Amino acid sequence: MNSLENLILVGVIKSCHGIKGHVILKSFTEPATKILERNLVNESGEDIHIKLISQNTKGELICTFNDIATRNEAENLKGYKLFCLRASLPKLEEDEFYIADLNHLPVLNQDHKEIGKIKNILNFGAGDIIEIEFLDQTTELLPFNKEFIPLITKDYVVLNYQREI
């Protein structure tokens, strides 16, 4: 069994597709089909086998999943998370990070005082957005780029942004 620290979330089953047990897979890899090159596991470390049927216009993958053969079985998989082992991922460049490593990192202001933490990194198609939960428990969505986040380390990020209070 693998601890979740050794696993990286690479996809999630969004819904079923058709009557033959196919599922729509939202891949977090770039390109989306890169997920097919990984040895996939579930949260318990059990192997997951998917086979690509097609790709829709949203970039989501339509796949067969393990031995699922009916729509009813596929409907039960909505929200099912697919992981790969961290050790199997390519080595990153100095300024690259996996989203899993950024979530929950402290957010510092320009004076390096902690002002919150990263709650999530999102992408709705127009670029990455960082969701920050500030110390007062409010959250804000900001563009995830060098202008707003000029420094990223493995221990914290620096935010270049003045909040309106």
Curated annotation (Swiss-Prot):
PRC barrel domain location: 94-165
GO biological process assignments: ribosomal small subunit biogenesis; rRNA processing
Keyword flag Chaperone: yes
Chief location category: cytoplasm
InterPro entries in alphabetical order: PRC-brl_dom, PRC_barrel-like_sf, RimM, RimM_N, RimM_N_sf, Transl_B-barrel_sf
Gene Ontology CC annotations of this record: cytoplasm; ribosome
Any single Pfam family the record assigns to this protein: RimM
Localization in the cell: Cytoplasm
Reported function: An accessory protein needed during the final step in the assembly of 30S ribosomal subunit, possibly for assembly of the head region. Essential for efficient processing of 16S rRNA. May be needed both before and after RbfA during the maturation of 16S rRNA. It has affinity for free ribosomal 30S subunits but not for 70S ribosomes.
Family: Belongs to the RimM family.
Domain comment as written in the entry: The PRC barrel domain binds ribosomal protein uS19.
Subunit structure: Binds ribosomal protein uS19.
Protein name stated in the entry: Ribosome maturation factor RimM
Record lineage: Bacteria, Pseudomonadati, Pseudomonadota, Alphaproteobacteria, Rickettsiales
